[in-house]
């Protein structure tokens, strides 16, 4: 994308932050690859919204899936999102994303510092290395934004948002692992019943020394 060299993509869970970044990127590259982690456990509303926005915005949508279907995984290991959510995320999110990122040099995200204590030191541009040794730039344009700024952008630009937000969820992932936050000051505390704050897709890479501004 403009000012950066290499092949770029964006990971998108169709939450509002991702839609803001995608809205901005489409003004530069309307065909930027949009990587969606299709875990098989998303809300029905998420799938419907994804399909609607993919058609309306003519997205270059790439669905990343685990090697096993939900039925195959549950037959082999039981319902991991209840017994071992970290392993479930590893199989259905981390491993597919690790494969999906290999062709790219630049990875755009909708991460923000105020989303969770685990993200408080997030920089807008970071150098990351995949487990395979592939290096890439991880770019989080909204790192210094807050929730109000995100929603103001959504409203100001008339962007349709995922209807699940209207049920009171400030952070939305797989349906079995999404609930109302236990800590009102930490929107991600409603994920995985408060057992953890990250699924692993933003922690499986090795972060090198950043080169860019805060």
Where are the language model's segments positioned?
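Nucleotide-activated chemistry modules centered on ATP-dependent adenylation/adenylyltransferase
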Residues: 1-214
